[in-house]
Amino acid sequence: DNGRSRGLGDVYKRQAENRESFANLLKDLNLLQPKNGLANSQLEALEISRQLGFPLLIRPSYVLGGRAMMVAETEEELQHFFEEALRVSPEHPVLLDEFVKDAVEVDVDLLADGENSELGGILEHIESAGVHSGDSACVFPPHSLSEKTLLELERQAKLLAKNLKVRGLMNIQFAVRDSEIFIIEANPRASRTVPFVSKSIG
């Protein structure tokens, strides 16, 4: 009604979509996230890069499909990619994330009622982390993750959904490197993987 999301209250929607609020929530829940920063200018971006190091994942705010998302290996690439990201979303800061090397990217889709949730599936990307999910093939069930890792992914996904008071579908993207699990982002809505998961599990 009136274009409002039925699955998530405004406060929790802002918490999921606002980078600073989301980072604070993950910290409170003892969940890992790649180190990151927000930059409104090239100078700020360079300062952040010197804190985080390279490579860095550069992406504009509030865009879909991985548009203008690039991995910068040098300050020169950072400056070029930053301008492109700012051009795509000029009203919002550019997101800079530590690039998690040698990681497996994972999508988790779940359905929640505000308190409890059920996982639809855990999908493992075939490409290495850093290729946007819209451009990446994935497999279900995951083929290289241990049972311990799968249980931990489920725990973290349900914990996050509960604390965001999600009512409806939610997609969470993870990067798994050895025994470390990083949360890349959480989207309290249906993702492109939902039809695939739905058909796979019947």
Across the structure, where does each feature detected by a protein language model lie?
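Generic structural marker for isolated residues within well-ordered, non-membrane alpha-helices
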Residues: 1, 23, 45, 157, ...
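ATP-dependent carboxylate activation and anion-phosphoryl transfer catalytic cores
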Residues: 6, 16, 29, 52-55, ...
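Single conserved hydrophobic/aromatic residue that forms the stacking wall/gate
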Residues: 1-12
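A conserved helix-loop-beta module that forms one wall/lid of the active-site cleft
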Residues: 10-69
